[in-house]
Amino acid sequence: MGVKGLNQLIKEHSPSAYKEFQLKNLFGRKVAIDASMCLYQFLIAVRQSDGQQLTNEDGETTSHLSGMFYRTIKMVENNIKPVYVFDGKPPVLKGGELEKRLLRREEAQKQKTALGDEGTVEEVLKFEKRLVRVTREQNEEAKKLLQLMGIPCVDAPCEAEAQCAELARGGKVYAAASEDMDTLCYEPPFLLRHLTFSEARKMPIDQIEYKDAIAGLDMTKEQFIDLCILLGCDYCESIKGIGQATAFKLIKEHGSLDNIVEWIKNNKTKYTLPENWPYDEARQLFMNPEVTNASEINLKWKEPDVDGLIEFMVKQKGFSEDRIRSGAEKLKKGLKGGVQGRLDGFFKVVKTDDKKRKADPKESKASKKKKK
């Protein structure tokens, strides 16, 4: 679900926190990717010409494997080293959001069934995409594929995006990559969005710098988390009638969500607090997420197991052997070279005062005389 309206607020108040670039601009970087999020994207986006998901001869869905294989290779070819982080058990507070998603899928199924044979291809596809969910089996298949590709995986104890942020904060990777804006609540130095999107979509990668984002909003870490909860997150519903502009204004005026709650309770306002609203529990989940300390995680990129890839992807899943072998060669080449150093990793960029940059006219004349 993410945090509704947060993207726009940061763009409005912290434009310097945003950068847009292409995949190649991340060369030399290690990135922790929210695996569950990108598997969901692959199941929706990787389709046949008729709009149906990719399947093998046995009718098993293979869109997630195709997307994971080729997008990972594209990153490695650009000298990027990905690590995929998988969700663990969901927090108890997330149960309400998961139940809502289930109800939305059930409603989509009813609407699709109601169309019968009279619905257009576009209408049917719209409801089919709403029915998409990543199964446990698909998660395990993705892990197996990545292992054979030589790409490291991490099983998070709880939320994958929190673990991605921990790896970034701990210096194991450069950034956390996820489409969920609430990843910023876990303080990754950088959040990357659209990293696993197909290049055919021609959508640049967004980079958001956490430090610049909260500086532009002029908020503390605690106020930023309160803002995200007020906007609506996976852990608790939002307050009806409070959108992004009002949420920002209220945090500025009252300083904290506790004060806002008291203000709503003690004054005749048009806002009504949800019954038993667990905002403080949600805050604690963001402040103290259940993660494995980055220092305890050892990330290793290995040479791909070509025979294993052929057995799994070709013999079991029905992919083209030529394409899998070609992909494996690209992986070998990319991973063998290692991550090349970036210039900004060796040199510290120092801003030069414009006045100092301009040569003194007297000095210039003097130097010319010496040359003569």
UniProtKB/Swiss-Prot annotation:
Highest taxon in the source lineage: Eukaryota
Residues annotated as binding Mg(2+) 2: D180, D182, D234
SUPFAM superfamilies: 5' to 3' exonuclease, C-terminal subdomain (SSF47807), PIN domain-like (SSF88723)
Residues covered by region (Interaction with PCNA): 339-347
GO BP terms in the entry: base-excision repair; DNA replication, removal of RNA primer
Cofactor note: Binds 2 magnesium ions per subunit. They probably participate in the reaction catalyzed by the enzyme. May bind an additional third magnesium ion after substrate binding.
Molecular function terms from GO: 5'-3' exonuclease activity; 5'-flap endonuclease activity; DNA binding; magnesium ion binding
Positions of the UniProt region annotated as Disordered: 353-372
HAMAP family xrefs: Fen (MF_00614)
Quaternary assembly: Interacts with PCNA. Three molecules of RAD27 bind to one PCNA trimer with each molecule binding to one PCNA monomer. PCNA stimulates the nuclease activity without altering cleavage specificity.
Protein name per the record: Flap endonuclease 1
Organism whose genome encodes this protein: Candida albicans (strain SC5314 / ATCC MYA-2876)
